[in-house]
C-alpha cells in the first residue's frame, strides 16, 4: 500500500502541473496478472479520489475482453477503461462494453491499435457516434494527422447524412 500511495501522490503532482487541463494516465502500473492489476488500479483510484487529485486513471493492461471490461468496471479499477476494439471479437461487444461503462459510471475510451485500417477507423467512428464514449482513438497509424482526419471526416459524413435524413 505504501508504494501505491507514492504512485498516487506522484500522479497528483503531475495533475497539478497539467492544470487547467485534466490529466488521464493510461496504465500507471503494470502488474503480473489481471487480478493484481485490478486491485492495484482500484487502490490507486481510491487514493486519487480521496485526495481529489486532478487525474484520471485509464485501465488498459490486463483489461482486454468484454468480461475484463465488466470486471474492472464493477470493481472501480480506474476512472476509465480503454476498450480495445479489435480484441472484443465483434461490433456488438464494442457497443455493449461502451454502454456497460456508461451505465456503471466508468469512463469509456474507445481505443484500439495503431495498426488498424482506415475502414476499421470509419466503422469505429459510427460506433462512437451511436454510443457516445468519453474519448475515442484517432486511428490508424502512429501519426496524428492521418488518424485524426480519417475519424473526423467520417464523423462529418455521419452528421451530414443525419441532417439530410431530417429533411
Regions found by a protein language model. Name each.
Residues 167:
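Expand to "…catalyze enediolate/carbanion chemistry for C-C bond making/breaking, isomerization
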Residues 1-130, 137-155:
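Catalytic core of soluble alpha/beta enzymes
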Amino acid at each position: 500500500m505504501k508504494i501505491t500511495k507514492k504512485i498516487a501522490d506522484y500522479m497528483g503532482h503531475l495533475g497539478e502541473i497539467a492544470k487547467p487541463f485534466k490529466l488521464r494516465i493510461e496504465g500507471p502500473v503494470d502488474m503480473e496478472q489481471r487480478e493484481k492489476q485490478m486491485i492495484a488500479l482500484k487502490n490507486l483510484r481510491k487514493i486519487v479520489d480521496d485526495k481529489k487529485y486532478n487525474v484520471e486513471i485509464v485501465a488498459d493492461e490486463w483489461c482486454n475482453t468484454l468480461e475484463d471490461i465488466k470486471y474492472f468496471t464493477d470493481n472501480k479499477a480506474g476512472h476509465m477503461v480503454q476498450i480495445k476494439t479489435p480484441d472484443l471479437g465483434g461490433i456488438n461487444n464494442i457497443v455493449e462494453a461502451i454502454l456497460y461503462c456508461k451505465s456503471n459510471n466508468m469512463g469509456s475510451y474507445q481505443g484500439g491499435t495503431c495498426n488498424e485500417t482506415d475502414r476499421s477507423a470509419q466503422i469505429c467512428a459510427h460506433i462512437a457516434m451511436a454510443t457516445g464514449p468519453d474519448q475515442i482513438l484517432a486511428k490508424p497509424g502512429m501519426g496524428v494527422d492521418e488518424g485524426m482526419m480519417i475519424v473526423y471526416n467520417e464523423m462529418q459524413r455521419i452528421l451530414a447524412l443525419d441532417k439530410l435524413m431530417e429533411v
